[in-house]
Amino acid sequence: MTPPQKSKPKRNRRKIYKILPQNQCPSVCQICRNPAIGYHYEVPSCNGCKTFFRRTIITGRKFKCFKVSNCLDGNDVIDTSKRVCRACRFEKCVQAGMNPMAIQAEAKTDEGEELKKLIAKKFENGEKLNDGTVFFNVHDRLNQILGKLIKIETKLEKVHDNGMPMGFLDQRDLSTALSSKVIYNNMEIPSMSYTPVKISKNTGLPKRRSRNFVHSSCLASIEYSKTFDFSSAIDISSKIILLKNTALSCANLTNAYTTFRKLKSDTLLYPDGSIYGPPRRKNGPLIEKQRSFLQNTLISFMTNNVDKTEYILLKAIVLCNPAIIDLPYADSKHIQREREVYAQCLFRYCLLQHGTLHGPARFSALLSIFNVLENQQKEQKDYYLYIKLIHSQKHKDPEVLKKKCISVIYDQIMD
């Protein structure tokens, strides 16, 4: 026979107001020791502590004591007209036995519902809350996500802004680039090849070299994608499908933001200040059309006066695109979950910045930039295909065609 299992001791949850004399109002609040006005959530308390506990549970707020978590200890009456440590006040409410399940109002956030259930479970099992238990409110969650994205953006600025090392070529394909570790400086690109300086036949002088900012901006988008949670959950083939559909749009967003906020220009520029697109000496209807559609995202940024936070969240949403047809369903779900987080953050940010009246309209205006991005990406790829076709007819030698290509990675993205 197996010995009988010991039952887990349960905390006595008999309601305090049922063991005290009838028709007698408690005199002291068990949290702040001010005069009590009655029993609230099964504990003698004042109106202030009752409201504080209810509001904390409903919103799921997070508080932190900056001392030693004993701000409300002792027997002295707490002056609630002054600022009281909210972390210690809430801990005192829990220790006194306030029952979150007695709150009739529903929690307004997932964090609030989680907090409510956790405290109720601890009470049932006769346990105490762990020291340092953390619950995020909306502001904390927004700041946490933004902090992570800003850190990533800052670290990848060198990849986008510095261009390729002069005279060096990145000859990797998209699969190889995605399989390697994240790089934060173009000098770290593995297996770069060096191209000797060419001498002009006409002048006898060395030809001007390009830093290939077009390639480095797309490379920055690829490195950016590796920092997201979904990157470790989906396979390499899904990553390639995703980047072929999103890398160029992310690069266009970064180019527009760099021009608008950093270089303070109303014409799209490369990070070194030179004009983006075909050289000024080239002209013609197709060239002018290209110059025109390259400005579209920048125009949207200027029209909507997009700030840094909005840009960073928009870029994350653009990258996390689960609606790509060829993506496997399981992989698209990973991407969708992450996209929903960034979309919610952008909506919350719009509400914080523009209020409940104008916030939703601001959110819609920012999302409308996606249409501009989609159209610009389509025009860029169509134009690239056209130019590629012309070169293939003009140059039959594959080696010559290879030299005309910006990079293997860019060619795959534009395909």
Swiss-Prot record:
A zinc finger (NR C4-type) spans 29-49, 65-88. PANTHER family: NUCLEAR HORMONE RECEPTOR. One of its GO terms (biological process) is short-term memory. Belongs to the nuclear hormone receptor family. Keywords: DNA-binding, Metal-binding, Nucleus, Receptor, Transcription, Transcription regulation, Zinc, Zinc-finger. The gene is nhr-153. Residues 26-105 bind DNA. This is Nuclear hormone receptor family member nhr-153. One of its GO terms (cellular component) is nucleus. It holds the Pfam family Hormone_recep. GO terms for molecular function: nuclear receptor activity; RNA polymerase II cis-regulatory region sequence-specific DNA binding; zinc ion binding. Orphan nuclear receptor. Residues 170-406 form the NR LBD domain. It is found in: Nucleus.
